[in-house]
C-alpha cells in the first residue's frame, strides 16, 4: 500500500484504506514466506489488525469438530492423458452421433408431417396430429432410456479418461438423457418416474425441483419423503484432472436439500437431515441423521431449513396430476406444434410452393421479400410478450394467498408453475437489464415492489429470476448484479407456500446470490458474490456479508467511493442521459442481431424444403445441423465485431464511463446459449479460441462460463466442470473493476466453482466444488483450495494431472 511503517493496531480497512484486492495480494505474499504461517482472506476479515492477525495465526489450531468432513478414500491412479489421435477421434465420433440423431429426428418428423398432411378435414388432421405426437413423444422419451441401458447398463464407481472411447459412450448417454422431453416435467411425479427408469433408487413421495438432471443415475439413492429444491447439482459424477469420476450420492428419508447446492460424489445425508441453501457437501462428507448443515463445505448448524409443513398429497393426486400433464401435451401442445405447420403451409401458397417439384418460389425474388417481411414478426414478440406478462400471470396470482400452505400437484400448484414459467423470460430480462428500462419492466410489467426508485442506469443486471414477481420487494437505492435468484416460494415434498422476499434499501448484491424469503438482511448491506444469505439471528444492517456460511465484513472501502461525486447533482443527470442513449442503441443491436439469425434460420428451412424431393430426410437433418453450426459461427462473428474497435482491457472506472457502457454492450449483444451443445467436446475449445480466449491444448470443458473471454488464459489440459465460472470483473455500488485471470496447465475447477478477476492459479491446482476464489488470489502450483471464500485445504494433488 506504500504506507511505510504503521501501527500494529491500525485497522486494515477503516484506517489504512485497504480493500479485498490489496489484502489478497498481502495473503499471497505471506504464503510465499516459509517463516510465516499461511493466512487466508477469512483470517484477514476476522482479524483486521496486525496484532489481531498475528495472535490468531499463532494460536494452536482447534481440535477438529465432530462434524468435520470425512476424508475421501484414496483414489486409484489416474489413467494416462489421451493423445492427439484419441482427441480427434472423439470429436469426430461426437459429430457423427449428432448428425445421426438429427437424421433420426428428421426421418420421424418428415414421415409424420407427410401422414398428417394427407388427412381430410380439420378434425382428421387434428386426430393424426395427436396420434403422431403420441408416438413421437414416446420415441423421444424412450430412446435415451434405451440407449443408456444398452451402452452403459448400470453405472458403477469408476474412472473414465476424457476423450477415450469410453468417454464417448458417457457423453452420448449424458447428452441424450438431458435432452429427453421428460426433463421438462421437473417438479412432477413424471420426473421422478424418469429417474427411476434410468436406474435411480427413488423412494415414495419424493419431490425433485432441480433441472440439473443426474447422469449416473444408478449411483443415486433418495429415500422416502425427500425434497430436492431448484438449482441443485447431484450429478453423481465429476471431472478431475482429465478423468471422469463417478460415485454415489445418498440421501436418506425426509431429507431437505435446499436451493443452489452441490452434492459431490461420495457425499450423503442421513434420515431427516437438512442442507441449507448456497451450500455444498464435498466428497466424503456425511451428514448424520437429523442434523442440519450449511456452508461450503458444509458444517453443522442449528438453523431449520424446512420452511413449510406437510399437506395432503397422496398417490391419487400425483397420478391425476401426471395424467393431466400428459393429456395437455398430447391433446393441446403437440397438435398445435405439429398441426400448426401443416395449417400454415395450407394457408400460405407462397410457402407451399417450395415443396412442389420444378421451378419454385425460391427462384422468385418476391419470395425473399416475403420471407423478410414475415421475419419482421420477430419484433412483434417483444410487445406481445410484455402485454402477456402484464396481464395473464397477474390475474392468475390472485388465486394464491401468500402465507397459505397448499398441497403439491393441485390447481394452485399448477397456477404457481405457470406464473414462474411465464414471468421468467430470459430474452426480455436480458433486453432490459443493465439499462434504465429494467426498473420499468420489473415494476410495471412484472409487478415487483421497487419502492421509490433511484435511477442509476444499472439497477439490475441481465440475469434475474424469481418464483413469483408479485411478492418480490427491492428497496430504494439498491443495485443488483447478475444471477440473483429470489426464492419467495418454499417447497416440501408434499406442499408449497409463497411469501414475500424483501431486499432492503441501499444494498448492493453481487453475482450468483440466492435470496430466500426469510433472509435476515436490512438497510445498507453489501452481499458479496455467492454469499449464503442468513435466515437466522438479528437483522444485518450497515455491514457486508461474505462467504458460506456468511460472516461480516466492511460495508464499503475507500476504493469503492472513488466516483461518489458522480452519484448526485446535475452531473448525474447529464451522464445518466448519455448512458441511456448508449444503452438504447445496445438494446436495438440486441434485437437486430437476433432478428438476422431468425431470418437466416427461416431461409435455411426454405432451402431444406426446396431440396427435400431430391435428398429426402437428409435435407432436413443437414438443415438442422447447419442451424447449429452456422449459429455458432454467426455469434462468434457478432462477439468479435462488438469488441473489434474497443478490445477488452483491465478497467477501473465509474458506471458512467463510456468504457463501462461498451462492456455492457459486450455482455448483452452476443449470445452464449449456443455454447451449451458443445459442452464436453473438443469443439468447445475451438469456439473459445475463436472468441479470443488464450486456451491451451486438450482442455476439457463440461460447461464453464467465461464472462470476458479475451481476459482469460487457460493452460493445457485443464478440467472445467459444469456450472463453473471465470468472471473477470466486479462491481461494488457505482465502481467497476476488471482484470485478467490465469488458469495454468492441468488445473481443475470443480462443479459450481467461481473464479473472480485478477486471479492466478498455478499448474495442477484444484479448486473444490462450489468454491469462491476471490479477486487477486494467487493459488500455488498443485495446491488444493476450497470453500467460500476459498483457502488452501491441501498440498500436491495425488493424481498424475496434465503431462
Model-predicted regions and their roles:
Residues 144, 221, 227-334, 469-589, ...:
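Glycine-rich hexapeptide-repeat left-handed beta-helix
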Residues 1-78:
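Phosphopantetheine-dependent thiolation modules in NRPS/PKS and related acyl-activating systems
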Residues 16-19, 30, 53, 99, ...:
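Conserved structural-core and active-site-/substrate-pathway-adjacent residues in large, well-folded domains
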Residues 1-2, 7-8, 39-40, 176, ...:
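Residue-level signal for pocket-adjacent positions within structured domains
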Residues 107-110, 338, 515, 533, ...:
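Short amphipathic alpha-helical segments with coiled-coil-like heptad repeat character
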Residues 73-200, 288-447, 540-692, 781-803:
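Terminal amphipathic alpha-helical/low-complexity segments used for targeting or macromolecular assembly
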Residues 168-254, 258-267, 282, 395-506, ...:
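Left-handed beta-helix
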Amino acid at each position: 500500500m506504500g504506507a511505510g511503517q504503521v501501527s500494529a493496531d491500525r485497522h486494515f480497512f477503516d484506517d489504512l484504506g485497504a480493500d479485498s484486492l490489496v489484502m489478497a495480494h498481502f495473503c499471497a505474499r505471506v504464503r510465499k514466506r516459509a517463516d510465516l504461517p499461511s493466512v487466508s482472506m477469512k483470517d484477514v476479515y476476522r482479524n483486521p489488525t496486525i496484532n489481531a492477525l498475528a495472535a490468531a495465526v499463532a494460536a494452536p489450531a482447534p481440535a477438529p469438530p465432530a462434524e468435520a468432513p470425512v476424508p475421501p478414500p484414496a483414489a486409484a491412479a489416474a489413467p494416462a492423458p489421451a493423445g492427439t489421435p484419441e482427441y480427434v477421434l472423439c470429436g469426430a465420433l461426437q459429430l457423427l452421433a449428432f448428425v445421426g440423431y438429427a437424421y433420426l429426428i428428421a426421418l420421424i418428423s418428415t414421415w409424420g408431417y407427410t401422414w398428417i398432411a394427407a388427412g381430410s378435414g380439420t378434425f382428421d388432421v387434428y386426430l393424426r396430429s395427436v396420434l403422431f405426437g403420441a408416438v413421437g413423444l414416446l420415441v423421444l422419451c424412450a430412446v435415451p432410456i434405451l440407449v443408456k441401458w444398452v451402452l452403459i447398463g448400470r453405472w458403477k464407481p469408476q474412472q473414465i479418461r476424457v476423450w477415450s472411447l469410453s468417454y464417448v459412450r458417457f457423453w452420448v448417454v449424458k447428452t441424450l438423457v438431458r435432452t429427453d422431453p421428460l426433463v421438462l416435467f421437473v417438479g412432477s411425479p413424471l420426473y421422478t418416474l424418469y429417474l427411476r427408469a434410468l436406474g435411480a433408487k427413488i423412494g415414495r413421495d419424493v419431490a425433485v425441483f432441480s433441472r440439473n438432471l443426474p447422469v449416473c443415475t444408478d449411483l443415486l439413492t433418495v429415500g422416502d419423503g425427500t425434497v430436492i429444491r431448484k438449482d441443485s447439482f447431484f450429478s453423481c459424477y465429476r471431472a478431475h484432472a482429465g478423468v471422469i469420476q463417478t460415485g454415489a450420492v445418498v440421501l436418506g428419508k425426509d431429507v431437505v436439500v435446499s436451493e443452489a447446492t452441490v452434492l459431490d460424489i461420495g457425499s450423503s445425508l442421513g434420515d431427516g437431515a437438512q442442507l441449507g441453501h448456497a451450500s455444498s457437501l464435498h466428497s466424503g462428507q456425511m451428514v448424520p441423521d437429523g442434523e442440519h448443515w450449511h456452508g461450503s463445505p458444509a458444517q453443522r448448524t442449528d438453523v431449520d431449513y424446512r420452511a413449510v409443513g406437510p399437506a395432503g398429497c397422496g398417490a391419487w393426486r400425483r397420478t391425476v396430476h401426471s395424467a393431466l400433464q400428459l393429456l395437455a401435451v398430447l391433446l393441446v401442445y403437440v397438435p398445435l406444434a405439429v398441426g400448426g405447420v401443416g395449417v400454415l403451409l395450407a394457408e400460405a401458397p407462397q410457402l407451399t410452393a417450395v415443396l412442389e417439384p420444378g421451378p419454385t418460389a425460391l427462384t422468385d425474388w418476391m419470395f425473399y421479400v416475403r420471407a423478410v417481411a414475415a421475419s419482421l414478426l420477430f419484433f412483434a414478440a417483444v410487445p406481445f410478450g410484455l402485454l402477456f406478462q402484464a396481464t395473464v400471470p397477474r390475474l392468475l396470482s390472485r388465486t394464491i394467498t401468500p402465507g397459505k400452505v397448499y398441497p403439491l400437484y393441485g390447481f394452485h400448484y399448477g397456477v404457481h408453475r405457470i406464473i414462474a414459467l411465464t414471468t421468467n423470460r430470459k430474452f426480455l430480462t436480458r433486453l432490459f437489464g443493465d439499462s434504465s428500462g429494467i426498473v420499468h419492466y420489473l415494476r410495471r410489467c412484472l409487478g415487483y415492489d421497487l419502492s421509490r426508485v433511484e435511477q442509476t442506469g444499472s439497477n439490475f443486471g441481465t440475469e434475474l429470476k424469481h418464483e413469483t414477481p408479485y411478492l418480490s420487494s427491492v428497496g430504494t437505492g439498491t443495485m443488483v448484479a447478475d444471477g440473483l435468484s429470489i426464492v419467495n416460494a418454499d417447497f416440501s415434498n408434499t406442499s408449497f407456500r409463497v411469501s414475500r422476499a424483501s431486499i432492503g434499501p441501499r444494498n448492493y448484491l453481487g453475482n450468483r446470490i440466492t435470496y430466500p424469503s426469510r433472509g435476515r438482511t436490512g438497510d445498507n448491506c453489501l452481499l458479496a458474490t455467492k454469499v449464503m444469505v442468513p435466515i437466522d439471528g438479528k437483522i444485518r444492517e450497515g455491514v457486508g456479508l461474505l462467504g458460506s456460511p456468511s460472516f461480516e465484513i466492511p460495508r464499503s472501502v475507500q476504493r469503492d467511493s472513488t466516483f461518489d461525486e458522480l452519484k448526485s447533482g446535475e452531473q448525474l443527470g447529464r451522464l445518466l442521459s448519455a448512458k441511456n442513449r448508449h444503452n438504447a442503441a445496445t438494446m436495438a443491436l440486441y434485437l437486430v442481431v437476433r432478428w438476422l439469425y431468425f431470418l437466416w434460420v427461416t431461409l435455411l428451412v426454405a432451402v431444406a424444403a426446396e431440396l427435400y424431393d431430391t435428398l429426402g430426410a437428409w435435407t432436413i437433418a443437414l438443415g438442422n445441423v447447419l442451424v447449429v453450426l452456422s449459429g455458432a459461427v454467426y455469434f462468434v462473428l457478432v462477439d468479435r465485431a462488438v469488441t473489434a474497435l474497443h478490445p477488452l482491457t483491465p478497467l477501473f472506472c465509474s458506471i458512467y464511463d463510456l468504457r463501462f457502457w461498451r462492456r455492457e454492450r459486450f455482455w448483452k449483444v452476443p449470445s452464449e446459449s449456443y455454447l451449451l451443445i458443445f459442452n464436453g467436446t473438443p469443439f468447445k475449445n475451438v469456439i473459445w479460441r475463436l472468441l479470443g480466449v488464450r486456451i491451451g491444448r486438450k482442455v476439457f470443458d463440461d460447461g464453464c462460463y467465461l464472462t470476458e473471454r479475451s481476459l482469460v488464459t487457460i493452460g493445457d489440459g485443464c478440467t472445467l466442470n459444469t456450472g463453473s465460472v471465470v468472471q473477470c470483473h466486479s462491481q461494488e455500488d457505482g465502481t467497476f473493476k476488471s482484470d485478467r485471470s490465469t488458469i495454468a496447465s492441468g488445473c481443475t475447477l470443480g462443479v459450481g466453482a467461481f473464479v473472480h478477476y485478477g486471479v492466478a492459479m498455478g499448474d495442477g491446482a484444484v479448486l473444490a466444488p462450489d468454491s469462491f476464489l476471490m479477486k487477486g488470489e494467487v493459488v500455488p502450483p498443485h495446491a488444493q483450495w476450497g470453500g467460500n471464500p476459498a483457502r488452501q485445504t491441501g498440498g500436491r494433488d495425488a493424481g498424475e494431472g496434465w503431462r
